[in-house]
C-alpha cells in the first residue's frame, strides 16, 4: 500500500549506527497531516487522498478554504497536496510520522534551491576553455552552429535561470523515525532549502 506525508526540511546532521558507522541524514519535521478529502473513481474519476499540512492563521484564509477544512474539523492549512492509491483513511484522520519506519525506502520531492541567472559551466557542468593569455575562449557556451544550420540548435545548453525546480530523488532510505518529536531522518540529502515543503512517498521502484 502507498504511504505518504508532508513535512518541512529542518537541515542536515549526522547519526551513528550501533556498529559506529557515521551516516549523514536530513531532518524532516512532519507534524500530523490531516485528511481533508477522500477522492474516489465514482465521484472524481480517480482514487486519492487530499491532505493538509501546517496550520494557517485564520486571518490569511478565505471562506471557501475554511468551509473545506471544516468537514475535517481542523484549522486551515498552508499546504494541501494529494496522494494517489492510499486506502483506509477517512476525512479528519491524521497521518503521523510513525506511518513510516526505519529501513523504509521512499521517494522525496522538493523544490530545488534557486541559484538565479547562471552560466553554462555552473548550470550544465560544461568544461571551460584554456585560461592562457592567448586563448579567447574561457567560459563561453560553445558553438551555436553559425555556418551549416544557420540557426541555434534546439535544446542548446545556454545561460539562464538555474534551480527553483520540482525535483524528486528516488529510493532514499529512512534512517530513523522519532514520533515524539514528529521527525523523520532520511539518509543523504534531499532537494530544497531549509523550511521548504518536502513530500515523502513510498518508493515507486523499491521492489524492482
Curated annotation (Swiss-Prot):
Annotated keywords: Ribonucleoprotein, Ribosomal protein, RNA-binding, rRNA-binding
Metal-binding keyword on record: no
Keyword Ribonucleoprotein: yes
UniProt-listed Gene3D superfamilies: 3.30.160.810, Translation factors
GO CC annotation: cytosolic large ribosomal subunit
Swiss-Prot/TrEMBL GO biological process terms: translation
NCBIfam families recorded: L3_bact (TIGR03625)
HAMAP family noted in UniProt: Ribosomal_uL3_B (MF_01325_B)
Protein's job: One of the primary rRNA binding proteins, it binds directly near the 3'-end of the 23S rRNA, where it nucleates assembly of the 50S subunit.
Subunit structure: Part of the 50S ribosomal subunit. Forms a cluster with proteins L14 and L19.
Protein family (similarity comment): Belongs to the universal ribosomal protein uL3 family.
Protein name: Large ribosomal subunit protein uL3
Gene behind this protein: rplC
Amino acid at each position: 500500500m502507498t504511504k505518504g506525508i508532508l513535512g518541512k526540511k529542518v537541515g542536515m546532521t549526522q547519526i551513528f549506527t550501533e556498529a559506529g558507522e557515521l551516516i549523514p541524514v536530513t531532518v524532516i519535521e512532519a507534524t500530523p497531516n490531516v485528511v481533508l478529502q477522500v477522492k474516489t473513481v465514482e465521484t472524481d474519476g480517480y482514487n486519492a487522498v487530499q491532505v493538509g499540512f501546517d496550520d494557517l492563521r485564520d486571518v490569511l484564509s478565505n471562506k471557501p478554504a475554511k468551509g473545506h477544512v471544516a468537514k475535517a474539523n481542523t484549522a486551515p492549512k498552508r499546504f494541501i497536496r494529494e496522494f494517489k492509491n492510499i486506502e483506509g483513511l477517512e476525512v479528519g484522520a491524521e497521518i503521523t510520522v510513525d506511518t513510516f519506519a526505519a529501513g523504509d525506502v521512499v521517494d522525496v520531492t522538493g523544490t530545488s534551491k534557486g541559484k538565479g541567472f547562471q552560466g553554462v559551466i555552473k548550470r550544465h557542468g560544461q568544461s571551460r576553455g584554456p585560461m592562457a593569455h592567448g586563448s579567447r575562449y574561457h567560459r563561453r557556451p560553445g558553438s551555436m552552429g553559425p555556418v551549416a544550420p544557420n540557426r541555434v540548435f534546439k535544446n542548446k545548453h545556454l545561460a539562464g535561470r538555474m534551480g527553483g525546480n520540482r525535483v524528486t530523488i528516488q529510493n532514499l532510505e529512512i534512517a530513523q523515525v522519532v514520533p515524539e518529536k514528529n521527525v523523520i531522518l532520511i539518509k543523504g540529502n534531499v532537494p530544497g532549502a531549509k523550511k521548504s515543503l518536502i513530500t515523502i512517498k513510498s518508493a515507486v521502484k523499491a521492489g524492482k
